[in-house]
Every structure is written in structure tokens, then in C-alpha cells.
């Protein structure tokens, strides 16, 4: 009886404990789900930031290229001015040798040139850059010839150049002819295709004739016997022979016999 009473008391207590345990289980499941969602959101934000980050670098690269070009052109213009300044003293020496009383002008120092370049307007610098971009080759040629005293390059073609050009033209023609011949082999004309089709048809007929001859040669005895049997039948069943019924024309068939009523045994 006591055991039964204890079981009855435990039943309601367990029923009360079941909702609390279910709530704890749900809370335990919700925590890892929340952590997983946080990790996924952090990963997505990092990926988006990585994909968005290269765009400003590309823009900076596009923006920085003109500045680099401008700096290179400025660096090219500065040595040209210094080189021009170095070529000025010989002209003054020639004037002195001629006897003319002209006061020598001092050559500008590099510091004064840099200050003058810095004081110049940006519009003038842009015009100089445009002029250098329009004709860089002529400026370089003049500077090179002035520095080293080399003669101008003769752009006229010589006989050797003409021979080389003729050789290259002949080689190109040879390559073109070879390519055309290869194309003609690869892509035959319609006439060749028609001839091929006729040849195939004639080949089939020739093979059929060879098969007939082979069969007749190996079966010539049978064919000969068949022909002879047909001739024998034609001889027996010829249209020239007339057949008569024996019961009507017995006298004609056997004239030695006579119809008599006397029979001998």
C-alpha cells in the first residue's frame, strides 16, 4: 500500500517537471542556432567588403596614370632646357672671336631654372606638354643631333632594301600559292564530286558482273544439265508430234493386230 501511495505521489510531480525540462531543451537548441546565424552574417559581411574594396584601387590606378604621364613629360622637358643652356656658350665665343664688343650673358643656373618653372602658370605647362606629345620624335632627333653631332638619318631606300622587299614579296607569293593549292585539295569542285559519284556507280555494276561470272563458272555443270533436260523435254513435248488415243486408233498404232472375237491362250 505504501508503494502504491508513493507511485501516485510521483506521478503528479513528474507531470509538473516535464514542461520545465522541455523549456530547457528548447533554450539549449536556440543558443547554437543564434551562434551559427552570427557566424554566417560575419562571413557574409567580410565577403562583401572584399568584393567592394578593389573598386577604389582601380579608380586610383586610372586616376594616377595621367599624373604619372605628366610627371614623365615634365622630367623630359627639364633636361631639354638644361641641354639648350649648355649649347649657348659656344655662340658667345664666336662673337668674341669676331671682335664684336658684346657683354657675355651669364648662363642660368639650375636653381633659377627650377624657380622659373615653379613660377610659370599651369596653363603654359599644359601647352608645353601638348606640344611635346604632338611631336616627341622631332624634338628627340634635334636634341640627339645637337648633343652628339651625328648626321641626320637618311630615310631613302637603297638597292639592298629594294632587293629585300622583292624577296619578301616573292616568299609571300609562294606561301599564298601553297595555301591555295592546299585549299583546292581540301575543297574539291562540284565536277570532281560528280565524277566520283559516277565512278562509284560503275564500280557497283562491275562488281555485280564479276559475281555473276563467278557463280556461272562454278555451277556450269548444273547449268549444262538443266539446259539438256529442257531440250529433252522440248523434244518429247514438241508441237510437231500428234498424239492419238490408243483405244480409238489401235489399228494405226499396231497394224499386225486385228480385232477378232477369237482369242488364243
Swiss-Prot record:
Which InterPro entries does the entry link to?
Answer: KCT2
Q: Which residues lie on this side of the membrane: Cytoplasmic?
A: 218-265
Q: Does the keyword Protein biosynthesis apply?
A: no
Can you quote a single GO CC term? membrane
Q: Give the signal peptide range.
A: 1-49
* Gene that this polypeptide is encoded by: KCT2
| Positions of region (Disordered) | 72-123, 135-168
What is the protein name for this chain? Keratinocyte-associated transmembrane protein 2
Which positions does the record annotate as the modified residue Phosphoserine? 229, 256
One Pfam family this sequence matches: KCT2
Ranges of Acidic residues composition bias in the record: 114-123
Q: Where are the transmembrane segments?
A: 197-217
Amino acid at each position: 500500500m505504501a508503494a502504491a501511495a508513493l507511485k501516485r505521489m510521483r506521478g503528479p510531480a513528474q507531470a509538473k517537471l516535464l514542461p520545465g525540462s522541455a523549456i530547457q531543451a528548447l533554450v539549449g537548441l536556440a543558443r547554437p542556432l543564434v551562434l551559427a546565424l552570427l557566424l554566417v552574417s560575419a562571413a557574409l559581411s567580410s565577403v562583401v567588403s572584399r568584393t567592394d574594396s578593389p573598386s577604389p584601387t582601380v579608380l586610383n590606378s586610372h586616376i594616377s596614370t595621367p599624373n604619372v604621364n605628366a610627371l614623365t613629360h615634365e622630367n623630359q622637358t627639364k633636361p631639354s632646357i638644361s641641354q639648350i643652356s649648355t649649347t649657348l656658350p659656344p655662340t658667345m665665343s664666336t662673337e668674341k672671336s669676331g671682335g664684336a664688343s658684346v657683354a657675355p650673358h651669364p648662363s642660368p643656373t639650375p636653381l633659377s631654372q627650377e624657380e622659373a618653372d615653379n613660377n610659370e602658370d599651369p596653363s603654359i605647362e599644359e601647352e608645353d606638354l601638348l606640344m611635346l606629345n604632338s611631336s616627341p620624335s622631332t624634338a628627340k632627333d634635334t636634341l640627339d643631333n645637337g648633343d652628339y653631332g651625328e648626321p641626320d638619318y637618311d630615310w631613302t631606300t637603297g638597292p639592298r632594301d629594294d632587293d629585300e622587299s622583292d624577296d619578301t614579296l616573292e616568299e609571300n607569293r609562294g606561301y599564298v600559292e601553297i595555301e591555295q593549292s592546299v585549299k583546292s585539295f581540301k575543297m574539291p569542285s562540284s565536277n570532281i564530286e560528280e565524277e566520283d559519284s559516277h565512278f562509284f556507280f560503275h564500280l557497283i555494276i562491275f562488281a555485280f558482273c564479276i559475281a555473276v561470272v563467278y557463280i556461272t563458272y562454278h555451277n556450269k555443270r548444273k547449268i549444262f544439265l538443266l539446259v539438256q533436260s529442257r531440250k529433252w523435254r522440248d523434244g518429247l513435248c514438241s508441237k510437231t508430234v500428234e498424239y492419238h488415243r490408243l483405244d480409238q486408233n489401235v489399228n494405226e498404232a499396231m497394224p499386225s493386230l486385228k480385232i477378232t472375237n477369237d482369242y488364243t491362250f
